[in-house]
From Swiss-Prot:
Name of this chain's protein: Sulfate adenylyltransferase subunit 1
Keywords: ATP-binding, GTP-binding, Nucleotide-binding, Nucleotidyltransferase, Transferase
Molecular-function GO term, any one: sulfate adenylyltransferase (ATP) activity
Annotated function: With CysD forms the ATP sulfurylase (ATPS) that catalyzes the adenylation of sulfate producing adenosine 5'-phosphosulfate (APS) and diphosphate, the first enzymatic step in sulfur assimilation pathway. APS synthesis involves the formation of a high-energy phosphoric-sulfuric acid anhydride bond driven by GTP hydrolysis by CysN coupled to ATP hydrolysis by CysD.
Start and end residues of each stretch annotated as G2: 89-93
The family this protein is said to belong to: Belongs to the TRAFAC class translation factor GTPase superfamily. Classic translation factor GTPase family. CysN/NodQ subfamily.
Record organism: Saccharophagus degradans (strain 2-40 / ATCC 43961 / DSM 17024)
Binding site for GTP: 31-38, 110-114, 165-168
Ranges of residues in domain tr-type G: 22-237
Amino acid sequence: MSHQSDLIETDIDAYLAQHEQKELLRFLTCGSVDDGKSTLIGRLLHDSKMIYEDQLEAVRNDNSKHGTTGDKVDLALLVDGLQAEREQGITIDVAYRYFSTAKRKFIIADTPGHEQYTRNMATGASTCDMAIILIDARHGVMTQTRRHSFIASLLGIKHLVIAINKMDLVDYSQETFESIKQAYGEVAKTLGQENLYFVPMSALDGDNVVNKSENMPWYTGESLMEILESVQITGAKNLKDFRYPVQYVNRPHLNFRGFCGTVASGEVKVGDEIRVLPSGKTSKVKEIVTYDGNLDKAFIDQAVTITLEDEIDISRGDMLVHAASDVQMSNRFKAHLVWMSETNMAPGKEYLFKFATKVTPGSVAAIDYRVDVNTFEHSSIEKMELNDIAVVELALDQQVVAESYQVNRGTGAFIVIDRLTNITVAAGMVIDVLEESSEAKSDFSAFEVELNALVRKHFPHWDAKDISKLL
């Protein structure tokens, strides 16, 4: 089978230009173990003619050694890249795949199904616009289905495709499809998910993946590919509120001072009056500079360099917003936290918190409750362990611009970094901005404060609390 475009062999520049203006859709696949995630992705790539002859030949050669589908070509081998994945027949790491059709470009995040890889799935879901949740038609809605749906909802994914797979093993039964559809509807109602698309399919045989199935004439809806090509996902992004975290101050010579970064949300035009946070100083946009020339307007996700009419002291970590924007800064937040480290988290330990380009020390002041991702029940805990998801209260040393993740992904997401190892130990989503603490302060002598600072600097593994915050 050949690639869908002959241009890639004859004129690579023309091929790239052809795809440059297409809209990009990022989606992830998730489901229980052996629901067919990797097979589905392999089928998407195969039927949309995005596989080269040598790739397909390699899969045929590996089929006898690692294949799990008998005489049929195991398309999952196209995407199960790690040797351990192939040998166990499961997905372990998040694998990103790229393909395109005549209408759209796609990035797929193939995420693990096992509960011990919850952190991997959360990572894959963080940049996606849509989730494909696979359900085995023989087993229906399972505990893992609820877990994946909860994580997708937590990460702000508004569009869910419920792919009821392996319909060939239940004789393409409409009754089975309707039963699972009703059962999942109850789960979605609990999570407040409304944009649902149900598709009966067989990824192994290709039914309703790219092409409509002749085995299920009772299904009159769209195939999976038709949904992927037509779904409108602009509503999931904040196109209104301009937020521009400064990543780098570019000063190549005395006559140029530009502020580099990526537009986190909204848009900005030349001449717009902007405000710099945290300083609060205002100016107007003079130029929007890119490698390909200046722009009149910059949109969400565009990487640009902005210059201002006035000389203002701006550094990495500052945020540019429209002057009229009502933006609240604080150093206390309520947030969902996904713990990704094998080292447990205890409230009060000091970490680095990274909001966009802003990094500040801080700690988890309190754990409100842990969320059971399988049952959605809440429980009290004293510390967070690997793959735990909890609602916590953050106390930061410095004020930052942060908003609810459900309102603005660009300013509502953050990561937590261990100060000693520099390893990312958690990812979080802001739920609410809290008022600054007005708790009663403790009294410590200057010597005690100085000694505490010395201990925290030279013996960070002791996890000493910063008593200066209690003054």
